[in-house]
Structure formats: structure tokens, C-alpha cells
Amino acid sequence: MRKFFILLLTLLSILLHGCSFDFNNGDNSENNVDNTLGKDYYDELHTENLYDDLFDLKNKIEIKVNIKETEIKKIEEDFQKYGSEGNIYRVADSLQITITYPDSYTSVYKIEDIGIRMKGNTSRHSFYNNGIRDFIHFKISFQETFDDEKLYKKSELISWDSLEERENRKNRTFFGLRALELKYNAEGDLTYSKDVYASKIYREYGVLAQQTTIGILNMNIGNKSSLSGTLGLYKIYEPLDRIFIKRNFPKNNNDGELYKATWGSAKGMPTLNTKSSKSYGVDDSMPGETKSVSYDLKTNKKKSNHQNISNLLNWINSSSKDISNEVSKYIDEDSFITWLAIMYLSGDWDNFMYDSNNFFMYFDESGICYFMPFDMDRTFGLLSKHRGMATIKPLDKYNLQGDNNRSNLLKKTIDVKGSVIQKKYLERIKEISTGVLNKDKFEEVYYNIYNNYKDDVRPTIQTLEYRYETDVDQNTFYHLIHEELITLNDSTNYNYTYSEYIKQKQRIVDRNIGWY
């Protein structure tokens, strides 16, 4: 089957141009990468095979970014000038992904002229001074055109030979994706497994969530060995975007409206506690400006009249104190209840329920809303000892931002004593708790990661001014929290081990569910 797959790729390479590939046994050198494969062959027959291979934990992934020193300096300059509101993509010459399969067979894929920028909200910080000095999160775009006069200086603008060529770039994909998100281990998760496991659990129980895996990040800066090397292990995330929707919904229902709940908007936290039409739309903020909306439309930007989100917000913020019986008119009820149950069981304090944060809403073509989590890096005991997440009860009304920020959607459904949604929520927790809080399933994820990467944790970039951290405190929360090992014993003053966490959480579930 694999030989047939290679033959298909070879035939396609004769017809197309723009990306590259190589298959080999043991030799991954960049010199062996064939530069003849097509501009968008990932939209052909084998797209999903490559996508699946990228996120298969049994496979070992290495991502290599080739970038000029002048361009990586611009990423630092953008942070210094704009802080967390500087989402300007800079040019990387190429990105190469190497997949090593369990049988040691390797495949190498390369794409040229990509966009790269810093990612995050409060996690952004200075990282470059005559070399990479600190870890940061990155966002990679395969579709950036670099021709927006509002963002780029005249000398930086790319001139496209034709509208067709520019349109091809705007539709270009790699591994069936338009972008990638790369995050370092900011939370000090020495298992490197908890948010990978969280995304897997959501999908297992029918909630749409981004695919997540682990890989080695290699930065080649100006072909200078003194500046280049690995940044150790990074988490690799599938973005939630129009391609994600088309991959996960049938053709007759995948052209709806996708909104991102934005943190730090000028219109307030995305609590769903407003009817205001000014809270939603297309974010038109420029670098350095606060985001202009709380719910940022990511698809159908030109044709949407925002009626679906308006209907949802008007319903949630009506005068009714109990809207449980009407949930299915506006929301996919089953996945909504499961989403809430897993949020509780995973102890994720940086989500919709506990922090009014980190969720998307997709309105399908009939107007029904599907909630989708993302950024699940504070789950299953990560940074949760001081939040009490292992011992919080299913109906506790905790919100990190204060009581006023608890969503009216929660207040009028699971908070209503004896309501139909509260009953279903508690039943769902009881039903899935042993499957979510499952040591065997977690360790399957962990040992796939451990076996592939146990010797690759320590970065090799010489300029990194990094120290080994054995704990996390509030002052160094987002700084160089890195160890040179992968271990199940990741307990600190702020982190529970997975075993500690699930033991306490299951005890709380068993003691409390029957009392409500």
C-alpha cells in the first residue's frame, strides 16, 4: 500500500509545482528533498493520509523553520512595538516537516515562503537579542500574501505576477491545513501529554476539538550554526478555521459561521452576557489596537448578517430565568452537555465555564450552535493546585474573573436547581467520568510521546539563556519552564501528577453526584 502511495505522489509531482517531498530510509538530509511536487497536492487523494500521519502520536515529528535573521528580528520588533496586539506575519524561507514512522521509515515534506509570527495574549514576551534567548509561541500561515499596505512597509511588500498566482497562495494548504500553531511547554507539564490527552478526550466523546501532537522544533536562522538549533519539544495544534469545519461537517452543513471568542476585547470578556450587536462581527483592529469585538467572525465575512449569533445572544439574555427546555432550538444539546462535563472533569480553569475564555462557536446552516474548546493547556492538574480544580464540585459557581463574569447561559441552565439541563449535565459527568479520568488511556498517550521524544527535550540552540525549573511560581509563570526529561512525576507546588488529579477528582464525583 505504501509503495502505491509513493507512486501516486510521483505521478502528481510531474503535473504540479510548489511544495516538495522526499521518502527515504534513515537519511533525512534536506539535500534529498525533491522540489518538484505541486503547489497544492495536499488537496488531492492523499490529503487526509498526511493529516492523519501528522497527528498520529505513534509517529515522530520534526518541524524545521528556515528564516533569515532580519525576519526573526522583525518578530521581536513587532512585540516591542505592539505587545500582544502585533499579529504581523514575517517571511520564513521554508518550513520542512519530517515524519518518522514506527518502522523507522521517514517522509520529508517542504513548503516555501510561509508566514510566521508570535502567538498568544499574556504569554508574549521578548525573545530575541542577537539570537533566541527565550521560548515563545508561534503561529505559522501557509496562505499569507505579504501585500497588505496597512501592515508592511513598501520595501516589504510582495508583488504578485497575477491575480491567479495570488489567489493560489490564499488557498494554499500543507498537510491539508492552512496554518499551524506551535506552543512551548509554558505550563511545566513534564508529561508533555495533558493537553494532547484533553483534545483526544473531547473528540472521543463527540465534541469537536483541534487535533494536537508533539514535535521537535528546529530553527535555522540565516544558515548560521551559532544561532540555529532545536528549541526542544513544542506542541503542534490544528487551527480551528474554515478547513476544520469542512473536515468535520458534511458538505450540506459546512458553510456556516465560525466565531472565535476573543480575550481582551474592547467590548468585554466573551461571557455571552450581552445582546449588543457591537460585541460581534469581523475584528478590524490594527497592530497595537485592542480587539474590536468579543466574537470575531472567521468565515463568511462578507455575506453574513450575524443573525444566528444575534438570535443566540437574545435568547440567552431574555427575561427568562430557566432556558433549559429551549436549548436544542439554538444549541446542539448533546455536545454542549458533554463539553461542560469534560470541562469540569478535566479541571480546565482557563475555559468558558471558569474563565469565560478559549472557545469557538460554529453556527451550522440551520442556525444551530456548536461550541468547540481550544487551548487546553491547563487541564488534568496543570497549574491547578492553587485554583482548587481537583476538589471543585460539579455545581460550584466558580469563575476566575469574578461572579459577574459567569455566563448567563450557565446561570439559566446548569445552575438552575432541578432543571432538565442540570440533570443531564450531572448524568453525563457520572456516565463518562471513569472514561475521562482514566489512567490507562492517559498513559497510552504519554508512552507514545515518551518513546518518541525522551532524548529530544533539551534544546540545542546555543544562545538560549534558559535554566531548569523544578517548580512554577507566579513570577516566572510564562518564562523558561523546561526540563530535560519526560516523566509522569510532574508534581510541583502548582501541578498535580495525572494520577493525583484523577484520584481526587473521581472521589469528588463519587461523593457529590448522588447528593444533587
Regions found by a protein language model. Name each.
Residues 2-9:
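Sec-dependent signal peptide recognition
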Residues 19-119, 447, 451-516:
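Regulatory N- and C-terminal appendages and interdomain linkers associated
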Residues 60, 71-73, 291-353, 358-516:
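Middle-to-C-terminal accessory/interaction subdomains
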Residues 95-186:
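Conserved oxyanion/phosphate-binding beta-strand-loop segments in alpha/beta enzyme cores
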Residues 146-147, 163-180, 184, 205-210, ...:
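Internal "kinase-insert"/substrate-recognition segments embedded within catalytic cores
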Residues 205-218, 351:
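Short, well-structured beta-strand/strand-turn elements
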Residues 213-229:
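Beta-rich nucleic-acid/ligand-interaction surfaces
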